[in-house]
């Protein structure tokens, strides 16, 4: 896959002297790697992700310096605005884990919140702030990494879908693409929202669904906040050109598709806990995905060839974000949208990625399910994936990220 996970994995493998090919059915970074909020954060993560997020931010900085900052990476800090101590206590596990890992953060009062985002303190008088967090430009990052790794000798083949993975004596032996078969001894599946479908063709079960998030960019606000901001109903990141990339910060659309029923038992706890933030939708997506395996069985084009890029249309909830921005922060009146878009993110039941060997298929490594957190984790995730492929000491302990937890 030619998203950031696949590209960074190839980068670290190439730096270790390996010969790599990246196959992308569409264009590099055309799906969730290029459609996300652009946060590179350590703050507020699941405790299992904290060590990886720390390493990832370090690698973002190192690589961006090598690339003359072609990714748009910058350290800016992340601020979560909170209404009361009860909301702050929801982050107690993360704060404890951050302290264990030596990650500096601050709990701010109203004056501290106002210093970072004037006006926010009126509704959100408590802040959780991690000053070392960063941001980058999603539309720039994947193409920049793709160009860089080609200079290292990696072949990046766009517009070429992988149709399947061949095995000999149970182990990986080749990748079958629409342009031919490539013999190999190691394969990494970093196919984002398409990973579960590809793995199922190998008899591997991965409970993965798609969630659709709608986003927008505003006109430039030269005097606006510099840190990335999250409050209930608003996520805001400053872009390199002074515009703000905004989204609702919690609401998403879940299309009802065949996998919704296939993995219903796995996701029931999520539905019970987060149902208020989830809009279920039954429509064209169901018909499209009903045809997936029928096309495959009949020997026709695979789903990966039929649908090169997931390109959903944004929904109306993004219209409410601009007024929220104007209400809660000073100096952001008369918000105008210059762009709107949407993207699917792949989600797992526990919202923590799988970075793991597939025990049932020797030579196969899986790196997927980043659950909307993958942009910031991409460099750490790619490095850890490469470590597993190479059999060297991993950058962090991968045991909590094992595929076997869904067995």
Language-model features and meaning:
Residues 38-112, 116, 233-236, 241-247, ...:
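Dinucleotide-binding Rossmann-like beta1-alpha1 core, especially the glycine-rich loop
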Residues 14-34:
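Glycine-rich FAD pyrophosphate-binding loop
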Residues 1-3, 25, 191:
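Glycine-rich Rossmann-fold phosphate-binding loop(s) that bind the pyrophosphate
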Residues 51-54, 80-90, 128-147, 157, ...:
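Short beta-strand to alpha-helix junction loop
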Residues 128-186, 193-197:
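Helical element adjacent to the flavin cofactor pocket in flavoenzyme catalytic cores
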Residues 8, 165-293, 304-315, 319-333:
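Flavin-dependent oxidoreductases
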Residues 5, 28, 194:
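Conserved Rossmann-like nucleotide-cofactor binding loop
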Residues 5-8, 12, 16, 107, ...:
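C-terminal lid/capping helical subdomain adjacent to the catalytic/cofactor pocket in oxidative enzymes
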């Amino acid at each position: 896959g030619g998203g950031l996970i696949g590209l960074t994995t190839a980068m670290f493998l190439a730096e270790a002297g390996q010969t790599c090919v990246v196959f992308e059915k569409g264009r590099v970074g055309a799906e969730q790697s290029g459609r996300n909020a652009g946060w590179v954060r350590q703050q507020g993560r699941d405790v299992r992700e904290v060590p990886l997020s720390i390493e990832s931010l370090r690698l973002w900085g190192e690589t961006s310096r090598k690339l003359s900052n072609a990714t748009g990476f910058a350290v800016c800090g992340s601020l979560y605005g909170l209404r009361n101590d009860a909301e702050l206590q929801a982050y107690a596990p993360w704060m404890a884990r951050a302290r264990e890992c030596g990650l500096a953060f601050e709990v701010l009062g109203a004056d501290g919140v106002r210093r970072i985002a004037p006006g926010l303190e009126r509704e959100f008088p408590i802040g959780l702030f991690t000053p070392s967090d960063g941001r980058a430009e999603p539309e720039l990052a994947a193409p920049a990494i793709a160009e860089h790794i080609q200079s290292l000798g990696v072949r990046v083949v766009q517009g070429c879908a992988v149709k399947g993975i061949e095995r000999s004596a149970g182990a990986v032996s080749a990748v079958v693409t629409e342009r031919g078969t490539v013999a190999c001894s190691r394969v990494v599946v970093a196919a984002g929202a398409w990973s579960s479908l590809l793995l199922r063709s190998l008899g591997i079960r991965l409970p993965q669904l798609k969630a659709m998030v709608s986003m927008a960019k505003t006109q430039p606000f030269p005097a606006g906040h510099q840190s990335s901001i999250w409050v209930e109903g608003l996520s805001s990141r400053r872009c390199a050109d002074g515009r703000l990339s905004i989204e609702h910060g919690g609401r998403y659309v879940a299309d009802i598709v065949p996998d919704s029923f296939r993995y219903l038992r796995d996701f029931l706890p999520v539905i019970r806990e987060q149902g208020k933030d989830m809009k279920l939708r039954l429509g064209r997506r169901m018909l499209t995905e009903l045809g997936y395996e029928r096309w495959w069985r009949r020997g026709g084009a695979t789903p990966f060839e039929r649908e090169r890029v997931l390109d959903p249309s944004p929904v109306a909830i993004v219209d409410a974000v601009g007024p929220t921005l104007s209400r809660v922060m000073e100096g952001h009146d008369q918000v105008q949208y210059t762009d709107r878009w949407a993207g699917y993110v792949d989600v797992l039941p526990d919202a923590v990625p799988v970075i793991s060997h597939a025990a049932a298929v020797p030579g196969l490594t899986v790196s997927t399910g980043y659950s909307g957190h993958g942009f910031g984790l991409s460099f750490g995730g790619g490095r850890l994936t490469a470590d597993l492929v190479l059999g060297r000491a991993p950058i962090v302990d991968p045991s909590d990220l094992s595929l076997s937890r869904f067995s």
